[in-house]
């Protein structure tokens, strides 16, 4: 019993000593366009920068203010933690919502959404902080 307790304490101490990144999942650190940014011209791509390496699978969807999907190209990794997705559709003045999904290098799926505005601000969609 005493040996089992010592082993349990040793494992507990070893786990506490691991770097916190061993338990962390990637998080979105920055995006271009920025959340709630008012742009003078339409962007040509959406860049997402994560806190750690992500897998080369993921998805981005772009919606206009009427919830119509706007065409985007294939998402590509431009560095181990940055993805770029070209915008192939036309962006008229208004508010746009970006919904994204990514996969951390540890296999954890992450997702989120943000808005940006082209030439004029419109109302932000419900549930999207902006």
In which residue ranges do the predicted regions lie?
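Absolute protein N-terminus
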Residues: 1, 23-26
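N-terminal signal peptide c-region/cleavage motif recognized by signal peptidases
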Residues: 19-21
